[in-house]
Regions:
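A cross-kingdom feature strongest in bacterial/archaeal respiratory oxidoreductases
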Residues: 1-33, 118, 124-129, 133-224, ...
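Long, well-ordered, tryptophan-enriched scaffold segments
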Residues: 2-99, 113, 240
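A glycine-rich, hydrophobic/aromatic-adjacent loop/helix-cap motif
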Residues: 85-137, 305
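Surface-exposed acidic, glycine/proline-enriched linker/cap segments
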Residues: 216-217, 536, 598-623, 690-732
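Non-catalytic, well-ordered alpha-helical segments in soluble enzyme domains
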Residues: 228-254
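Surface-exposed intrinsically disordered loops and tails
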Residues: 356-373, 686-707, 739
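Iron-sulfur cluster-binding cysteine motifs and their immediate structural context
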Residues: 569-588, 598, 632-658, 664-682, ...
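Long, compositionally biased charged/polar accessory segments in the mid-to-C-terminal portions
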Residues: 699-707, 711, 721-856
Length: 856
């Protein structure tokens, strides 16, 4: 829904674009996408919600005086935001986070009702269930644990080990046995029974959505191992011998009031049972909360800790997933571990020097070079303490945090959990080297999301932090291009910066070509030379009469920065599709990660910074960068073995068996998107990379052959000494071409239809930010995206002529907001870049866009 409201190529479409305000304590991808963002401690947001609701109700003539105390926030920010909400009455909505208090949700519901927001509340049936606290008070004779891992992630005040040991019999259904799971190990120590659980993709089951709609769960594959589902176990306890499939059919027949095979098949195909949702609350009478909304005082001595699920491990469930462990956190870009996130102001109070990031944008660039050792980020270690409980971890300075809020990620510090979760290094006599630190000691039943009254102290130690992006700023370059809705209204070509804005007209007869066709046949810069036309097939005689249908299709991609949220789905989808290995923490610290897509994150401040100060309240933009499949690719000209060449479809291809590993191509690639297999990452596991070809058998082969089962048989598995990169999923292109030829039969119409090919990153993108297809077809979706006024190429002044282009980001700014700037902060940086260009070299300076002064 968010992405659908952010698509705009014309002034008329931009006028209908949604505007997003976000109030949060730590930086999230939602906050990064915001047009206006306010930093506030989590413990203050309930009071701030009451303040917002009171302002909304007062403006709409329904005053409600809520008791708010201790809240320090910009009155102007709140009033202008509320004025915008009221002006958009009927099309405005306030969403409260699930970690806020019940009273906060109540006042937000009141405000939404006054705004005319179409919010439906479902009447969820009451469930007869007790709590773990009830179990502690009255131990169960038989304790059945279905899934989860309460021995690891139960609230700290719940002594789950005591609960389990007090039971006469413990039955544990879980994915991992006692050697790899804390709860399974606890059940074993209590003399219990372990039952291997089936994955949901191997199971028949059913469930309810948030609004109560009845949905099926159906298996996609046969179970890999002998295992059982929740339904198997519950049915056995109930004395039933029915299979899960029969139980699901029985439940469906009860709810759908039919035993028809056709009705059941339709339910499986559609995925929902119409009319099965819980009834909505029609008369939503919400009493004005009588409770006072108090914002506690925060300081260096009384900090707030925000507890968040990890982008890598969730709450710990995915801690043993190597793809997620090595997928960078969207904002901090850390991998394989969690860190203590602190604000720049808090870091200054703790006398922690900023890392060696390029962070000063306007004025002279300053670096602090004392924090990097051999290219590694060295972080100071700190201890956090609350109510006598302490956790220790590395400190990471993060822009955009509330001043006295510390961010902690859950899901790390597992004592058991498998090769990835615990990183057992067999080279060190089986010693567990650690994978982050456990912060669950801070989580209690009364405080599931944040704690206040926390103290912090430096221990004096340091440790390397595994971080995939040390560079924070574009230094005023025009790699990522942004504009406001006002920019688009005044100048549709606002994204044409630098050489794009000053290149001469396309030569002669080619002036009427579509932008996509110009990109394939005409060099930039008014040259009279044209590349050879690859559109004529060599076997026209065999296809006489169908010459127009025999053009060799030219593939290209467009990425819309305005809808990209930086979620990392494309990174992991590419890794899954193309057999990209997980290399491990030690190799990432050496800069040897293998991802074909790099999701760059840039902070923009646009204000003069003193010394090496990190900006406290920046804007953020994400940019997905993979091989650009350049028309004039710099990598091709330097390869001595012709291992990377251009094919007639416009793809920059790799011949792996020709590659001799000189890495000249990686050196000459201006986008830095090529990856080199320094070791046999696909053949061996972490901890055995250096053992050589005669190493022990266990280093070569997984006992269950699971890695082999995971790999895509249509993609080559690369070995040591070979360079690799994005291929535009050439295996999917070939499959689509084969299917098109089979469907054509004698007609000769072998062109692949638009949309028939979805590359892995495009298919996984939840925002629909990626378009891929034939750029010589002016009616294809990718051609229309490239014809957008927001379309541009990265580093085009190098005459690489990339096949992948981008659509500039738009921010729908409210000019009345305090501190609002006419241009997005990245544009201010570009405009102010000349003040430090001489010190950094003028070879990559970007001229200002048409009609825009470089001095503001």
């Amino acid at each position: 829904a968010y992405s659908a409201g952010r698509r705009a190529d014309t002034a008329a479409e931009a006028a209908q674009m949604t505007r997003l305000y976000v109030v949060e304590s730590t930086f999230t991808i939602t906050g990064a996408a915001a047009d206006h963002r306010l930093r506030a401690a989590s413990s203050h947001i309930s009071a701030l919600a009451a303040r917002f609701a009171a302002e909304v109700l007062a403006k709409l003539g329904k005053p409600a005086a809520f008791k708010v105390s201790g809240l320090k926030v910009s009155d102007e920010w709140v009033k202008e935001c509320v004025a915008d909400l009221v002006q958009a009455k009927g099309q405005a909505l306030i969403v409260a986070g699930d970690h806020l208090s019940a009273d906060a949700h109540r006042v937000v519901a009141l405000a939404n009702a006054a705004l005319g927001a179409a919010v439906r509340y479902a009447a969820v049936p009451a469930v007869r269930a007790g709590t773990i606290a009830d179990l502690a008070a009255k131990p169960a004779k038989t304790l059945v644990i279905l899934g989860g891992n309460p021995a690891y992630d139960a609230p700290a005040d719940v002594k789950f080990a005591a609960v389990a040991k007090a039971a006469t019999k413990v039955v544990r259904l879980g994915f991992h046995g006692p050697a790899f799971d804390e709860t399974s190990a606890l059940a074993q120590s209590a003399g219990g029974t372990f039952i291997a659980a089936s994955h949901y993709l191997e199971s028949w089951s059913d469930g309810r959505t948030v609004d109560g709609t009845y949905v099926p769960v159906q298996p996609m594959i046969e179970p890999l191992f002998p295992s059982f589902t929740d339904l198997d176990v519950l049915a056995a306890f109930a004395g039933s011998t029915q299979e899960p499939y029969a139980l699901v059919r029985e439940t469906f027949a009860t709810l759908a009031k039919t035993k028809s095979d056709d009705a059941f098949a339709a339910w499986l195909a559609e995925g929902v049972l119409a009319g099965s949702a819980y009834p909505t609350v029609v008369d939503l009478t919400l009493a004005v909360p009588s409770a006072a909304f108090a914002a506690p005082e925060l300081s260096l001595e009384k900090l707030e800790v925000r507890l968040l699920p990890s982008a890598h491990a969730g709450d710990g469930l995915y801690a043993n997933n190597g793809w997620l462990a090595e997928a960078p956190d969207p904002l901090s870009k850390t991998v394989w571990e969690n860190v203590i996130l602190v604000s720049p102001k808090l870091a200054a109070k703790l006398a922690i020097e900023p890392e060696a990031m390029v962070i000063n944008k306007i004025g002279a660039l300053n670096r602090n070079i004392n924090q990097l050792v051999d290219g590694r980020l060295i972080a100071k270690i700190a201890r956090l303490t609350v109510d006598g409980v302490s956790v220790t971890g590395p400190v990471f300075i993060m822009p955009g945090l509330a001043d006295h809020t510390v961010g902690l990620q859950l899901g790390f510090g597992r004592k058991l959990g498998g090769r990835v979760a615990t990183r057992v290094d067999e080279r060190l006599a089986g010693r567990v080297t650690g994978n982050g630190f456990d912060v669950y000691p801070f989580l209690t039943t009364a405080h599931p999301a944040f704690r206040t009254g926390v103290t912090i102290e430096l221990t004096g130690g340091t440790t390397p932090v595994c971080n995939m992006q040390d560079h924070w700023s574009m230094e005023g370059r025009d790699v990522v291009r942004e504009g406001s809705v006002g920019d688009l209204e005044k100048n549709a070509d606002f994204a044409k910066l630098g050489i794009d804005g000053h290149a001469p007209a396309v030569y002669g007869k080619d002036g009427a070509m579509s932008p996509a066709l110009k990109a394939t046949t005409t060099p930039r810069g008014n040259s009279a030379y044209e590349h050879p036309d690859h559109a004529v097939a060599p076997n026209l005689v065999a296809w006489k009469g169908h010459e127009s249908e025999l053009k060799i299709q030219q593939w290209g991609m467009s990425i819309d920065l305005n809808t990209c949220t930086g979620c990392n789905a494309c990174v992991t989808a590419c890794q899954s599709e193309n057999n990209i290995p997980v290399v491990g923490r030690d190799q990432v610290l050496k800069g040897r990660n293998m991802h074909w897509i790099r999701l760059d994150r840039y902070f923009f401040d646009g204000r003069e910074q003193a010394g090496n100060a990190i900006p406290e309240d920046p804007q953020v933009t994400f940019m997905g960068v993979a091989c650009q499949h350049c028309e004039t690719a710099p990598c091709e000209t330097v390869c001595p073995a012709n291992a990377t060449v251009h094919d007639d479809q416009g793809l920059n291809t790799m011949a792996y068996n020709r590659c001799i590993g000189t890495r000249y191509c990686a050196n000459n690639c201006p986008y830095k998107v090529r990856r080199f297999n320094f070791l046999d990452f696909n053949k061996r596991v972490d901890g055995h990379y250096y053992e050589g070809p005669l190493g022990p058998e266990k280093a070569v082969k997984d006992p269950a052959d699971l890695p082999q089962l995971q790999r895509n048989p249509d993609v080559s598995v690369r070995m040591r000494g070979v360079m690799e990169k994005c291929t535009y999923c050439v295996q999917r292109i070939q499959e689509a071409k084969i299917q098109a030829k089979a469907a054509a039969r004698d007609s000769g119409r072998t062109q692949v239809a638009d949309g028939a090919i979805q590359v892995a990153c495009q298919q996984a993108c939840p925002a629909g930010a990626i378009e891929f297809g034939d750029i010589t077809d002016p009616n294809s979706r990718v051609s229309k995206a490239k014809a957008s006024t927001r379309s541009y190429g990265a580093l085009t002044y190098l005459n690489t002529r990339p096949r992948t282009t981008y659509q500039a980001k738009l921010r729908n700014l409210n000019d009345k907001m305090p501190g609002a700037l006419r241009l997005p902060l990245s544009r201010r940086e570009m405009a102010g870049r000349e003040s430090h260009a001489p010190a950094h070299g003028s070879g990559h300076a970007a001229p200002a866009a048409h009609g825009e002064s470089a001095h503001k």
